[in-house]
A protein has these predicted regions:
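Regulatory N- and C-terminal appendages and interdomain linkers associated
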Residues: 1-21, 62, 134, 169, ...
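Conserved ATP-binding subdomain of kinase catalytic cores across diverse folds
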Residues: 2-112
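Short, solvent-exposed coil/turn linker segments
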Residues: 9-14, 107-119, 222-241
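A broad, structural surface signal
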Residues: 64, 68-72, 139, 143, ...
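Short alpha-helical "patches" and their helix-cap loops
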Residues: 80-88, 158-167, 271-272
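ATP-dependent phospho-/nucleotidyl transfer catalytic cores
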Residues: 91-95, 100-145, 269
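Conserved kinase catalytic-core segment
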Residues: 124-188
Length: 272
């Protein structure tokens, strides 16, 4: 599977202006963003977590893994590339791994967060999950909850789900994006904690639509329609080409997390 979605040769991206800064729930540090081009040529760049001293590459590797895993599952998503690059931040040069992605909006579409859309169109007493069902998005949300469970994603707040508004007045849920704060990202490369991490731990998540429990959310929507099954080989494929980017210990644990969680999903699905 390794190919055009990983750029190993060092790229000089010191010309990028990292003028967009965002913090993610539960993280220590800032995520820096940049962009080039416009319209169909618009490219977004995203650095992993930066605390003013070091850059942690885990989130960007996770975005690529999630992108590849959703390819295997047949889930619509934003495609990410993983790029080895030199960047300039606050006058200091860093060598790191970062993500790039393209604009997923069609011509004339506007985007707004699901939270903002909910505030505009919700009915009295309506909860986000009920709201999404009313708009016919229940299968989109179910597929999102499946990938969030498999990736142990801790951050699916309202701004990490977008609605796209077309000129004809119709709306659709945007392809899934921002799955980086997942797997081992919160452990910041601590090998002792990585080794000890329970692959089935019900990690708390910030989730606008569901609860703080990823497994509870999955049980609510299982069985998930419109996804392909995984086996050991198809789970291994997304890790192609990642050798040397993260430690072998981390990559093996990440693969174990996805394998064990898919097996748990199969158990949940079989009980329905």
């Amino acid at each position: 599977m390794a190919g055009r979605d990983i750029v190993r040769s060092l790229q000089d991206l010191t010309n990028l202006d990292w003028n967009e800064r965002a913090s993610s729930s539960g993280t220590a540090g800032t995520y820096l963003k940049a962009r080039t081009g416009s319209g169909s040529r618009l490219i977004y760049y995203k650095l992993p977590r930066y605390n003013g001293v070091v850059i942690d590459s885990y989130e960007c590797v996770n975005e690529l893994l999630a992108s590849r895993l959703m390819d295997a599952l047949g889930i619509e998503h934003l495609a990410y590339r993983l790029i080895h690059a030199k960047v300039l931040i606050d006058g200091a040069e860093y060598e790191t791994w970062l993500n790039s992605s393209r604009n997923f909006r069609k011509v004339g579409e506007r985007k707004l967060s699901l939270g903002a859309f909910f505030d505009l169109y919700k009915e009295p007493g309506e909860f986000p999950m009920e709201f999404c069902r009313r708009f016919g998005w229940q299968e989109d949300i179910a597929r999102m909850m499946l990938i969030d469970y498999l990736m142990a994603n801790r951050d699916r707040r309202a701004s990490n789900i977008e609605v796209l508004a077309a000129p004809d007045g119709s709306f659709r849920i945007a392809p899934i994006f921002d799955t980086g704060f997942s797997l081992l990202a919160p452990l910041a490369g601590d090998l002792e904690r990585i080794t000890a991490f329970d692959p089935l731990a019900d990690v708390a998540t910030t989730n606008f639509v569901g609860s703080r429990s990823l497994e509870e959310n999955l049980r609510t929507v299982a069985p998930v329609e419109g996804v392909k099954d995984l086996d050991e080989a198809r789970i291994a494929e997304p890790f192609d080409g990642l050798e040397g980017i993260l430690s072998d210990v981390a990559l093996l644990k990440m693969r174990e997390i996805i394998q064990r969680r898919w097996a748990r999903y199969e158990e949940i699905r079989a009980d329905r």
